[in-house]
């Protein structure tokens, strides 16, 4: 059966597939070497996590020179990032044990429970205000959590379940598009109240992608997409500081913009320019010396470009390209096996990781206006690392179940 399906899957049978559980007679499946998960996907993910950890350390090593961070050691962010990665890997190990059927059954409840977090951040003494935005819930012990990162994952699994349930009426405006638009409006209102337009942009993109991949009516999908894009344009037009960002992006080198709205962009471009092909060397960045704000989060790629050059940036871009392509391959395999929910989830994860990486890379290279989105799996930030790794774990689970089914087993 596996050999007959290989032409449709567009990939060669790999060694890991050969080591999957094999059914002997009527006995239960046995494992030959326990290579049950996509080893390449695991290693590429670990590579990005390790790469990000090293660059976060490099970007923050001089922070303690500033009076604002004088009470912290040079290893403060490195230790916190290492702890976040360890917690994310532990959570991923738990998530990868959950069957996709169970995840689908609980997807709606997970989604609506996650919306409670978006409400909590708006409440006094619960939500933490940073630079005029309330995006974090504060827990005892100084731990912060960003609910919008959780909503990215729960919205994805909910949208996939929604499209599976609506397959018979997926062409209907009243039964498919309007309910999804209503849900998106609720999420949008809560996120824009923080405000967090970047997270809303990612969630809207994920939802639209799943509607499209799920076979929604083409004309209605186009109208829905135009409405969403129009809403974002309207928000920019009605917001003076968002308009300033657009104008600054168009002309970042004017004196007023370079010292104002385009300050981060201009310094990110300077960092990229200094790096040239091979960079100035690990640890040799000048822009991280309190010139480039958020060098360890939104603009980590600029520091990579400065210290490791175009080659270092190219490694990051290729790794994300590989993950996105692998996610779509896994989704296509699931679809061939008549597992539509798993297919939509896998490809939705590809859209999420790839889309957010594309926006972050575009901002760092000056190809897109400045937007507060981190680089998945690499930038400093415990909530984002946790949910990115959990998303990869779900992707591994989909692939694992695909392999079991292709070998004649049951999940």
Swiss-Prot record:
E.C. code? 2.4.99.28
Name its cellular compartments: Cell inner membrane
- The protein's predominant localisation is membrane
Answer whether the UniProt record assigns the keyword Secreted to this protein: no
Query: Which segments does the topology annotation call Cytoplasmic?
Result: 1-40, 103-109, 158-172, 218-219, 320-347, 396-411
**Which GO terms are recorded in the biological process aspect for this UniProt protein?**
cell wall organization; FtsZ-dependent cytokinesis; peptidoglycan biosynthetic process; regulation of cell shape
Q: Which Pfam families match?
A: FTSW_RODA_SPOVE (PF01098)
Bilayer-spanning residue ranges: 41-61, 82-102, 110-130, 137-157, 173-193, 197-217, 220-240, 299-319, 348-368, 375-395
Q: Does the keyword Cell membrane apply?
A: yes
**Membrane topology category:** Multi-pass membrane protein
Q: Which residues lie on this side of the membrane: Periplasmic?
A: 62-81, 131-136, 194-196, 241-298, 369-374
- Give the catalytic activity: [GlcNAc-(1->4)-Mur2Ac(oyl-L-Ala-gamma-D-Glu-L-Lys-D-Ala-D-Ala)](n)-di-trans,octa-cis-undecaprenyl diphosphate + beta-D-GlcNAc-(1->4)-Mur2Ac(oyl-L-Ala-gamma-D-Glu-L-Lys-D-Ala-D-Ala)-di-trans,octa-cis-undecaprenyl diphosphate = [GlcNAc-(1->4)-Mur2Ac(oyl-L-Ala-gamma-D-Glu-L-Lys-D-Ala-D-Ala)](n+1)-di-trans,octa-cis-undecaprenyl diphosphate + di-trans,octa-cis-undecaprenyl diphosphate + H(+)
Keywords, A to Z, come to: Cell cycle, Cell division, Cell inner membrane, Cell membrane, Cell shape, Cell wall biogenesis/degradation, Glycosyltransferase, Membrane, Peptidoglycan synthesis, Transferase, Transmembrane, Transmembrane helix
A GO cellular-component term linked to this record: plasma membrane
Q: Name one GO molecular function term.
A: lipid-linked peptidoglycan transporter activity
Broad enzyme group: transferase
Instruction: Please state the span of the N-terminal signal peptide per the UniProt entry.
Output: none
Q: Which InterPro entries match?
A: Cell_cycle_FtsW-rel_CS, FtsW, FtsW/RodA
Pathway it acts in? Cell wall biogenesis; peptidoglycan biosynthesis
Entry similarity comment: Belongs to the SEDS family. FtsW subfamily.
Its biological function? Peptidoglycan polymerase that is essential for cell division.
- From the Swiss-Prot or TrEMBL record, give the protein name: Probable peptidoglycan glycosyltransferase FtsW
Q: What is the originating organism of this protein?
A: Thiomonas intermedia (strain K12)
Q: Which gene encodes it?
A: ftsW
């Amino acid at each position: 059966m596996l050999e007959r399906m290989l032409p449709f899957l567009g990939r060669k049978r790999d060694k890991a597939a050969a080591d999957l559980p094999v059914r002997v007679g009527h006995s239960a499946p046995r494992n030959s070497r326990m290579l049950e998960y996509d080893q390449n996907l695991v290693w590429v993910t670990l590579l990005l996590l390790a790469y990000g950890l090293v660059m976060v350390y490099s970007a923050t090593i001089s922070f303690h020179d500033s009076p604002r961070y004088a009470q912290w050691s040079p290893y403060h962010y490195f230790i916190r990032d290492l702890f976040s990665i360890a917690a994310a890997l532990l959570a991923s190990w738990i998530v990868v044990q959950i069957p996709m059927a169970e995840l689908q059954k609980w997807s709606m409840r997970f989604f609506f429970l996650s919306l409670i977090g978006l409400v909590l951040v708006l409440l006094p003494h619960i939500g933490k205000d940073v630079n005029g935005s309330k995006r974090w819930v504060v827990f005892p012990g100084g731990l912060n959590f960003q609910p919008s990162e959780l909503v990215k994952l729960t919205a994805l699994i909910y949208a996939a379940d929604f499209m599976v349930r609506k397959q018979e009426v997926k062409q209907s405006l009243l039964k498919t598009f309007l309910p999804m638009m209503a849900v998106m409006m609720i999420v949008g209102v809560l996120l824009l109240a923080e405000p967090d337009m970047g997270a809303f942009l990612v969630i809207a993109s994920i939802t639209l992608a799943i509607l499209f991949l799920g076979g929604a009516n083409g004309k209605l999908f186009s109208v829905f997409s135009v409405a969403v894009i129009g809403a974002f344009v309207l928000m920019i037009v009605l917001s003076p500081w968002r308009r300033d960002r657009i104008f600054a992006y168009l002309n970042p080198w004017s004196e007023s913009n370079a010292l104002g709205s385009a300050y981060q962009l201009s310094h990110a471009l300077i960092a990229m320019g200094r790096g040239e092909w091979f960079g100035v060397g690990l640890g040799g960045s000048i822009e991280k010396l309190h010139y480039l704000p958020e060098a360890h989060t939104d603009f980590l790629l600029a520091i990579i470009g400065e210290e490791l050059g175009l080659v270092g940036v190219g490694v990051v871009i290729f790794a994300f390209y590989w993950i996105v392509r692998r996610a779509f391959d896994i989704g296509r395999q699931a679809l061939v096996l008549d597992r539509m929910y798993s297919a939509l989830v896998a490809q939705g994860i590809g859209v999420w990781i790839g889309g957010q990486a594309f926006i972050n890379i575009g901002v760092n290279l000056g190809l897109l206006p400045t937007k507060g989105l981190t680089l998945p799996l690499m930038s400093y930030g415990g909530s984002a690392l946790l949910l990115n790794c959990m998303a990869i774990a779900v992707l591994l689970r989909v692939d694992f179940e695909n392999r079991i089914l292709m070998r004649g087993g049951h999940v």
